[in-house]
């Protein structure tokens, strides 16, 4: 297990969890979401391959439409 900070809250995840798996676990699959890990944007094209590590600080931001 690893410990991460997700939007400011501690969360425990299985080792090897990817950004894509986290998004799916949270019920946000298919939504427009920006992901930042340790202050760096993770492009959607890398969500499936970017494994989270112990101590990572993750921010998820939902994209909102409007005008």
Please give the residue ranges for each predicted region.
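Ubiquitin-like/PB1-type beta-grasp interaction modules and other compact soluble beta-rich domains
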Residues: 1-66
């Amino acid at each position: 297990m690893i410990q991460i900070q997700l939007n400011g809250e501690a969360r425990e995840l299985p080792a090897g969890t990817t950004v894509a798996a986290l998004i799916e676990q949270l019920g946000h699959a298919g939504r427009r979401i920006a992901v930042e890990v340790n202050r760096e944007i993770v492009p959607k094209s890398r969500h499936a391959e970017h494994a989270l590590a112990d101590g990572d600080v993750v921010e998820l931001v939902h994209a909102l439409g409007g005008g």
